[in-house]
Amino acid sequence: MITIAVPMVISALITNVTNLIDNFTIRTRLAHAVSENLDFFKETFSASLLGSGTLDKDIGTYLYGCYFSALDFKNLITSITMSLGVSAIPALAAAVAMKNRKEVGSTINSVIRICMIVAAPAGLGIAALATPIMTLLYGGTNAENLIPISSPIVMIYGIATFVLALSTPLTNVLQAMGRADIPAKTVAIGAVIKVVCNFIFVGIPELNIYGATIGTILCYLFIIIANLYFTMKVSGCRINFISTIVKPMICATVCALCAYGTRMLLLNVLTFGDPSSRLNGANLSTLFAVAVAVVVYAVGMLLIKGFAYDDIVMLPKGKKIAKALEKFHLIG
């Protein structure tokens, strides 16, 4: 128990300390970049800075606030996949204890697939509708001036969501197999990558706050590649990348394109309302686009048999739904 608990505590400690250092490096490097290139920043973000009444001395703080507002979207999806990873620990631990290699492999693949089924469409959908979603939430409020700055960050993290979303579930998988020491090491290395990237990229005026996304993505990319490798090595099982990653990504890409296309078409039809109000054609177009994207994704996954029987069973009345879908050969 101690051999599992200690690495888990260390891993959590490293993550929390890294977040503190991460915030500190972003703020300090951004402040340095602004002080050295004040005119560049005033010109680049002139509309938002003037609209918000931001003083020259507060530009760095304002830009960090814009970055922080975009993190809610990044954390929303990862919090869902985090719970999926935790819920799989008992079943996986039992399979490992019984040395049931087939069940271990099946559970690992199921965890990754379900996370991707949730994260891929949500992330790419948010990326495709980043500005409209931000406008829906912040338009007509005191925070609307951050939309032009925050939207690109939301889009970048949306595209990279599948990378961020798989990190914690893979950590849970390794912990369930009794190798909690591995995530602790990969998280530590990832933390170093993140801090170094922040120091380099955030300090570049042309990248500024957007440079923080580079460090985050490279950090988590290293963590999931390393954890995937050790997951396969420790379990002795292979990951079916076609069913777990490729199929959800294909359908999610189509889903995102449909969301974007639907909104662009509806903008020409739903032209009512004041743009500064929440109740207008543009916002309604965004909501319709999201609904269409959900339907397109679900139908697409069924057509290419992207859902597995075990995935459907976990839903309310899942067994009945799974049996019905099996009759039409719509699940893998």
Question: Which residues make up each language-model segment?
Answer:
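Interfacial transmembrane-helix starts/ends
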Residues: 2, 68, 88, 100-117, ...
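Hydrophobic alpha-helical transmembrane segments
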Residues: 11, 189-193, 209-230, 292, ...
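C-terminal transmembrane helix end/exit motif
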Residues: 23, 217-267, 295-313
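Alpha-helical transmembrane segments of polytopic membrane transporters and translocases
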Residues: 40-56, 61-81, 112-117
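Helix-loop junctions and terminal segments of transmembrane helices
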Residues: 81-98, 108, 171
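Interfacial segments at transmembrane-helix termini and the short loops linking adjacent helices
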Residues: 127-161, 273-278
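Membrane-interface junctions at transmembrane-helix termini in multi-pass inner-membrane proteins
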Residues: 159-189
